[in-house]
Amino acid sequence: MGSYLNPGNEAFAVALNSEIYVDKTGLLTYTNKVMNTLQGYICNSRPRRFGKSITANMLTAYYSKGCSSKEMFSGLEISRAKDFEKHLNQYDVLHWDIQWCMEPAGGPERIVSYISEKTISELKEYYPHILPEGIRSLPEALSRINAASGTKFIVIIDEWDVLIRDEAADLKTQEEYINFLRAMFKGTEPTKYIQLAYLTGILPVKKEKTQSALNNFKDYSMLHAGPIAPYVGFTETEVQKLCEVYGQKFEEVKRWYDGYQIGKYHVYNPNAVVNLMLEGEFQSYWSGTASYEAIVPLINMDFDGLKSAVIEMLSGDHVPVDVTSFQNDTVSFANKDDVLTYLIHLGYLAYDRTFRTAFIPNEEIRQELILATKRKKWNELIVFQKESEQLLKDTIQMNGNAVAKEIEKIHRKYTSVIQYNNENSLSSVLSIAYLSSMQYYFKPIREFPAGRGFADFVFIPKPEFQNYYPALVVELKWDKSVRAALDQIRDRKYPESVACYAGELLLVGINYNKKTKEHECRIEKIKR
């Protein structure tokens, strides 16, 4: 058992010994299926604290010849597979954590030589008569061993992208590292000695121009995870079971930590869910996982529409995004779509693959983004929030004229000329205008099923604020009148479906005159 060749199973044992362990060994069924095939080159990227290292340690514990793990995996999902014992501890495994290797290597520029030297040294102990003295190329060493003995290797690289993310300015180090990976995995010779390759990190494989630097790898990411989607985070079923055990309300857990849509799965942040179950408090557990310094410089980049897109998403809207141009690094940003795509990979945004839109997935992330912008003084958002807070105050005080003026101002500022006279744009403007309401209200519900129809917007106060803030039913009209809007709310009995959510209920009618581009607003109160 070595440090890098055939490690033991101690690291995975720590995960199994923890109070909460959610069984993800079903992934091994897939890796067993694709090993020694063209599909056996996997890059699985996901955000921090989404279980990347636990997965890498699980693969090592299952495949490595350096340990005996039958008892460890008994009772877990993989133990019920027909080929469970066929692959159990049967392979020579190379496992490197690039982040950890940085310190003993003496710096990023020494990573490739350090990994090569240490791994070759361990290979010589296992295969003493095959490797000649002075050999320095790890790919060559693996090739020689395969030629002499027929041995094939499973290679697992944790934090594979740390040099791409953290050493973006050091092009020489990056180039050396990418060339090392190419030599390890790409071409005819590596197919002879690679049984399975599994890379995990935050970013998918680096692109060069539009082509992946390792185009034989299959990228599974927060954009698309294919067959391994249920193993990216906690699934809804897994979270429901934890809620039953720990007595948590599932709907509240869903509001705080759900939102990542990967294939047919709703995926939850494992770190947040585990901390909630153990500590019992709904809050953001994200702060320790990423730096505020990384967020605001990204959204402050001078790209058309970037800042307004972020404000739209903070208000609950989805924004279109083209994820195809991102180069999978932290420097080659060409437009707002590249920035949004990077934020998706970081976990600050989620991606709707069907409609090709980005959005803020849940309450935890919304709070983190707002907190980050406050700490780093993103002035545009700070000013906008103050305006939004005044709008909410005017709404609650039933000052219809002030509300109309503020919505008109935002309508002009955040809607393009082409979209200005468009009912959908007015709906988006309303979401943006009431951004500050997110402190006290759930995300506004569009087309809320109520009475004999669907209310345009409903704002329901969070439980802790229901005695202080009224529920809001908002109806939008186009070239009609505010009276028509309020009459529709009453005639279709919308209030009856909403009144139970708060002590008071405000009916808000808003009309937009397409010809004059003026807005009107009237507000009425209903007491329960």
Residue ranges of model-derived segments:
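Structural motif
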Residues: I154, P470-V474, L506
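Metal-dependent nuclease catalytic cores in nucleic-acid-processing enzymes
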Residues: M184-T191, T341-L349, S431-S436, Q488-V508
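Extended hydrophobic-aromatic, low-complexity segments
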Residues: D352, Y441-R446, F465-A471, V482-A485, ...
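Conserved catalytic cores of phosphodiester-cleaving nucleases, focusing on short active-site segments
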Residues: L430, A455-P461, Y469-K480, R492
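Domain-level recognition of nuclease-like catalytic cores that cleave nucleotide substrates
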Residues: S497, Y501-R528
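Mg2+/Mn2+-dependent nuclease catalytic core
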Residues: Q174-F180, W478-P495
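Catalytic centers of nucleases
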Residues: P444-E464
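Phosphate-binding site recognition
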Residues: M1-N422, S437-Y441, I445
